[in-house]
Structures are given as structure tokens and as C-alpha cells.
Design a protein with these regions (language model features):
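Residues at the starts of beta-strands that form the adenosine-phosphate
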Residues: 2, 32-35, 73
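Short, glycine-rich nucleotide/cofactor-binding loops
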Residues: 3-18, 46-50
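Short, conserved beta-strand edge motifs with alternating hydrophobic and charged residues
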Residues: 5-6, 35-39
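Histidine-anchored nucleotide/phosphate-binding helix
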Residues: 17-30, 34-36
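Short beta-alpha junction loops
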Residues: 40-43, 80-81
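N-terminal beta-loop-helix "entrance" segment that forms/cooperates
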Residues: 42-56
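A glycine-rich helix N-cap at a beta->alpha junction
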Residues: 52-80
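C-terminal structural segments of small proteins and small subunits
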Residues: 84-86, 90-115
């Protein structure tokens, strides 16, 4: 099964990205393919310069680990990146700047789509 997850809120203000990561982990354990589409403020979580304190979760690193396992992609709204001053050299390895055409394709091709937006 192909699962699409869209997140729209900042990574450390709300727990939507944590929820998306947990859903992705569970789905991948069952052999499903997961695509995460980051829109609006959620694009901040792909900034590899984020340095959370020792006791907090490192969301960018968690996304890298999921991509390394396979069957997991991260797409980032390019306009949202530009709006927030995030450049391609700042984003985590493996993530893909994309846009609304890719989101539309994801909606058309996935079996399930989850939208997390606080």
C-alpha cells in the first residue's frame, strides 16, 4: 500500500511531525511505502542546521534515518522553502524540493492520504 502524509505546522511547536513519523514507522514495518509531503511551516524540519537540545528529539535526523531504511520519501514544497529562507544546501540529504504538481500526483496515486494540520 502507498501512504501519503502531509504536514503543515512547525516541527517543534506541534507534534504533528512526531505523529507522521510514528505512522510512517508503523506502516513501513508492515511493508508499506510512505511519502511525506511538507507544506507551509513544516518545511523547517528539513533544515539540517537544526540542533535541538540533548533531551529533545532530532526530527531532521529521524527523517534521514527513515529515508535510509527505504520505502520512505520526503517532499518539500519549494515555494514554502523559499518563503522561509531555506535553501537546497540547507536541507537534509535525500529530501526532494517539489511543489503542488507532485502533491497532486501523490493524492492521485496513493491508497491512503493523511493530512495533519493542528
Amino acid at each position: 500500500m502507498k501512504i501519503g502524509i502531509q504536514v503543515m505546522v512547525p516541527p517543534y511547536t506541534y507534534e504533528d511531525l512526531d505523529t507522521a513519523i510514528k505512522i510512517a514507522e508503523a506502516a513501513m514495518e508492515k511493508g508499506h511505502e510512505v511519502t511525506l509531503f511538507l507544506f507551509a511551516d513544516s518545511v523547517i524540519c528539513t533544515n539540517k542546521n537544526i540542533k535541538p537540545i540533548r533531551i529533545d528529539r532530532n526530527i531532521p535526523q529521524k527523517l534521514v534515518e527513515l529515508m535510509q531504511k527505504g520505502n520512505f520519501e520526503v517532499h518539500i514544497c519549494g515555494i514554502c522553502m523559499d518563503y522561509r529562507g531555506i535553501t537546497t544546501d540547507m536541507i537534509i540529504d535525500g529530501s526532494k524540493p517539489s511543489g503542488l504538481p507532485e502533491l497532486a500526483n501523490l493524492l492521485a496515486t496513493c491508497d491512503r492520504f493523511i493530512n495533519l494540520m493542528a
